[in-house]
């Protein structure tokens, strides 16, 4: 069924068609090769914005550092990072004045979180800079490696499992004169294969101990690894993003917890809520401004854009904010929270992989690692790269660049939002003391500013005052990229507001289609996406019906499961036709077995197996839902699974879908080739880790799973749990006396082994 897309717009008001202009169909652009150039750009730009600051040298690492705080007041419209401490503190004080008790209450909430958070919180997240191996690893592996190294260096606070104790270890590790770490390396040998008699390269993985002195350790602990941000639509140039190591992550987490708690209490904050909740919050602010301006005032809205938000923020400013927010709190709490900004003031940016050179004539390729950029002859580089390297050279230490000012992307989203909101808060009439006043919305670096005044001059004066106030705290509103409109039409975080929010449907386009997990999950995810868009994004019934038909078509082509009576020939046609002929009730066959599609927009909430269950032949039911079916390696099935769907911008979001276990819920086996590489040791660690976690979850089914509080290890928790369960089972007669005795004996043996270790 092919559709003429113009039909979709016959009755659509112009503003609703905005979404069709978004660059969201097709594959997004990915980066290839090295991110070194983008990282150097970031470092150089950041220093340029703060160039009139004071230079100092870090006494521990010898890194040159630039401090722009309380620098010269701006004389032009160029972006700059010269925030004034007293202005930031005053903005905080006014924010507290208009929200009595907000900081106090958020501190109390955060203190509770700090005392309860387990160290496993750090296993969330994907790639993390692993300082022991000097490259990126999955978060869980990087954490395990860090704890292992700490343990072998006599730091044991983390064994209690509380994050705060792990952070104590981090602090102690920075005072040590040297640290001993285990690194992985590869040995290659040429050996003759017995079967084929050919020479093959055999790789073995060695682990070797290495000592790192205090300076090198500090550099690694303060390093952010950089990568190129992938899949960014609507941009010609790529940019660099940072991934911090385990030493920094825990501290950042607590600061962001505090800031999140504050943002939740601020009506102008677009974080941490999302989706419909966010729209409601924003609509409230707009309503407030429009209601007040109906009779006598004009009201205008700026769809705002800030120039290089991260690169003009400054960790020293965040330190000042935290010092103010936590004033009257216990000393230990203030210390824990001030460490993250202090570490960021001394951060180092790792330049990534370096450059790849190839000589066309000699067919040679060679990698110039970042470590060599400090000393290599610049004649090999083109002009723009040469300029970058010359500029960055004074900042280089061991292949990392000292980067004191600036924040790197996505590290303190919540805290920087608090700073932005504190400026919006100053727009109340009691602070402006004139006829104009403003309010607005802030979400990380994105903002919308609503200004009310009796006449146009007042509006202009209000905007100017806002612009200058922002400059004082290191926020640079871009005059080129911001635009102003009568209130009622603006854009904020890709939500388009036109007397109410317009559904920007194109943002959801990338999540339509077949996910490629397996036949069962893909069908379920596909219909759930359509259902969710009917609920949240104005996907009308006719379009939804069409989306469904296109999805089924796509699904059948992906899994080659066209209807049993179709003319289309594929590899699976023979089996599917045979099944079709043998089946009495053809309507009961799943689409993935060549059956008809019974979905329409009224029954999208029902999993396909349930929808067709009554229509299935009995022997088909028996084959389909048989856990003993030898051809399927099953996942353990929960009633609800999570799929990762890709909206057009923002992080991949998790979406729940119903999971009914059938023989179509297979999981592909892992690629074996990893076993011959340097990753093998890591893979084994990861599997070990996985096994321990699975075992732990067997002991604590999710219903009774309370994170153990207090100082017990996983093993102790499991042993005590086993004893309690065994006693209950024995007393209720579910197990015999001998079984009970055996369980008790095993528990004692485990405890004995732990004591001997």
Curated annotation (Swiss-Prot):
* Compartment(s): Host nucleus; Host cytoplasm
What reaction is this protein's catalytic activity?
Answer: RNA(n) + a ribonucleoside 5'-triphosphate = RNA(n+1) + diphosphate
- In this chain, composition skew of type Polar residues spans 55-64
What InterPro entries would the database entry show?
Answer: RNA-dir_pol_NSvirus (IPR007099), RNA_pol_PB1_influenza (IPR001407)
Which Gene Ontology terms cover its molecular function? nucleotide binding; RNA binding; RNA-directed RNA polymerase activity
Pfam families referenced in this protein's UniProt entry, alphabetically: Flu_PB1
Indicate the principal place this protein occupies in or around the cell: host cell
Enzyme Commission (EC) number: 2.7.7.48
Q: What class of enzyme is it?
A: transferase
Q: Where is this motif: Nuclear localization signal?
A: 187-195, 203-216
Span list, region Disordered: 50-82
Q: Cellular component per GO?
A: host cell cytoplasm; host cell nucleus
Tell me the ranges covered by the RdRp catalytic domain, including all copies. 286-483
The region called Promoter-binding site is annotated at 249-256
Q: Name one GO biological process term.
A: symbiont-mediated suppression of host gene expression
Q: How is it modified after translation?
A: Phosphorylated by host PRKCA.
Keyword line: Eukaryotic host gene expression shutoff by virus, Eukaryotic host transcription shutoff by virus, Host cytoplasm, Host gene expression shutoff by virus, Host nucleus, Host-virus interaction, Inhibition of host RNA polymerase II by virus, Nucleotide-binding, Nucleotidyltransferase, Phosphoprotein, RNA-directed RNA polymerase, Transferase, Viral RNA replication, Viral transcription
Task: Give the similarity note.
Answer: Belongs to the influenza viruses polymerase PB1 family.
State the protein's purpose.
RNA-dependent RNA polymerase which is responsible for replication and transcription of virus RNA segments. The transcription of viral mRNAs occurs by a unique mechanism called cap-snatching. 5' methylated caps of cellular mRNAs are cleaved after 10-13 nucleotides by PA. In turn, these short capped RNAs are used as primers by PB1 for transcription of viral mRNAs. During virus replication, PB1 initiates RNA synthesis and copy vRNA into complementary RNA (cRNA) which in turn serves as a template for the production of more vRNAs.
Q: Quaternary arrangement and interactors, per the entry?
A: Influenza RNA polymerase is composed of three subunits: PB1, PB2 and PA. Interacts (via N-terminus) with PA (via C-terminus). Interacts (via C-terminus) with PB2 (via N-terminus); this interaction is essential for transcription initiation.
Protein name as it appears in the record: RNA-directed RNA polymerase catalytic subunit
Q: State the gene name recorded for this protein.
A: PB1
């Amino acid at each position: 069924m092919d559709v003429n897309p113009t039909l979709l717009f016959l009755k659509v008001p112009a503003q609703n068609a905005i979404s069709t202009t978004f660059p969201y169909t097709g594959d997004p652009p990915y980066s290839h090769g090295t991110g070194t150039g983008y990282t150097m750009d970031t470092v150089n730009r950041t220093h340029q914005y703060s160039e009139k600051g004071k230079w100092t040298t870090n006494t521990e690492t010898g890194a040159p550092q630039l401090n722009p705080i309380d620098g010269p007041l701006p004389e032009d419209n160029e972006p700059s990072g010269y925030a004034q401490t007293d202005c930031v503190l005053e903005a905080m004080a006014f924010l507290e004045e208009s929200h009595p008790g907000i900081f106090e209450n958020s501190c109390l909430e955060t203190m509770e979180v700090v005392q309860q958070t387990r160290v496993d919180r750090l296993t969330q997240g994907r790639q993390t800079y692993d300082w022991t191996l000097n490259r990126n690893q999955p978060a869980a592996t990087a954490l395990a490696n860090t704890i292992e190294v700490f343990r072998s260096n006599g730091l044991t606070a983390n064994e209690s499992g509380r994050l705060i104790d792990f952070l104590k270890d981090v602090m102690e590790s920075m005072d040590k004169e040297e640290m001993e770490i285990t690194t992985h390396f590869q040995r290659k040998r040429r050996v003759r294969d017995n079967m084929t008699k050919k020479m093959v390269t055999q790789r073995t993985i060695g682990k070797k101990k290495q000592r790192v002195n205090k300076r090198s350790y500090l550099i690694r602990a303060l390093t952010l690894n950089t990568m190129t941000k992938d899949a960014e639509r609507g941009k010609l140039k790529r940019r660099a993003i940072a991934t911090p190591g385990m030493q920094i992550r825990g501290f950042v987490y607590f600061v962001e917890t505090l800031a999140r708690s504050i943002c939740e209490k601020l009506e102008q904050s677009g974080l941490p809520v999302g989706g419909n909740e966010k729209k409601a919050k924003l609509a409230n602010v707009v309503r407030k401004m429009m209601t007040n301006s109906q009779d006598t005032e004009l009201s205008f809205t700026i769809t705002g854009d800030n120039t290089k938000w991260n690169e003009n923020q400054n960790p020293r400013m965040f330190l000042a904010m935290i010092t103010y927010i936590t004033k009257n709190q216990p000393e230990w709490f203030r210390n824990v929270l001030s460490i993250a900004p202090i570490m960021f003031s001394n951060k180092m940016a790792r330049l990534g992989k370096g450059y790849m050179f190839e000589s066309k004539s000699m067919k040679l390729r060679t990698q110039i690692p970042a470590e060599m950029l400090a000393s290599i002859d610049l004649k090999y580089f083109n002009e723009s790269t040469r300029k970058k390297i010359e500029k960055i050279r004074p900042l280089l230490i061991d292949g990392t660049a000292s980067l004191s000012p600036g924040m790197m992307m996505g590290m303190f989203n919540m805290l920087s939002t608090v700073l932005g909101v504190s400026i919006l808060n100053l727009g109340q009439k009691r602070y402006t003391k004139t006829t104009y006043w403003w309010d607005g919305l802030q979400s990380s670096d994105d903002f919308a500013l609503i200004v009310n005044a009796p006449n146009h001059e007042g509006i202009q004066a209000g905007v100017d005052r806002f612009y200058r106030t922002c400059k004082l705290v290191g926020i640079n509103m871009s005059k080129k990229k911001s635009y102003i409109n009568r209130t009622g039409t603006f854009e904020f975080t890709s939500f388009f507001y036109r007397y109410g929010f317009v559904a920007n449907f194109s943002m959801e386009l990338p999540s339509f289609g077949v996910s490629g997990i397996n036949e069962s999950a893909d069908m379920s995810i596909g219909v759930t996406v359509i259902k969710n868009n009917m609920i949240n994004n104005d996907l009308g019934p006719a379009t939804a019906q069409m989306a469904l038909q296109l999805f089924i078509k796509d699904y059948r082509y992906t899994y080659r499961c066209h209807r049993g009576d179709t003319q289309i020939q594929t590899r699976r046609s023979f089996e599917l036709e045979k099944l079709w002929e043998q089946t009495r009730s053809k309507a009961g066959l799943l689409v993935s077995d060549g059956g008809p599609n019974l979905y329409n927009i009224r029954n999208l909430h029902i999993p396909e197996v349930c929808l067709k269950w009554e229509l299935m032949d009995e022997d088909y039911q028996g084959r389909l839902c048989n856990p003993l079916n030898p051809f399927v390696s099953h996942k353990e099935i929960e009633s609800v699974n999570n799929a990762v769907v890709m909206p057009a911008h923002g992080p991949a979001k998790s979406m729940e879908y119903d999971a009914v276990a059938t023989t179509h819920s297979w999981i592909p086996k892992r690629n074996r080739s990893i076993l011959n590489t340097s990753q093998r040791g890591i893979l084994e660690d990861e599997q070990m880790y996985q096994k321990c976690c699975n075992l732990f979850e067997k002991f604590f089914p999710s219903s009774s799973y309370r994170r153990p509080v207090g100082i017990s290890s996983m093993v102790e928790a499991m042993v005590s749990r086993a004893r309690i369960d065994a006693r209950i089972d024995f007393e209720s007669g579910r197990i015999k006396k001998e079984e009970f005795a055996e369980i008790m004996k095993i528990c004692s043996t485990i405890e004995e082994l732990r004591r001997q270790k």
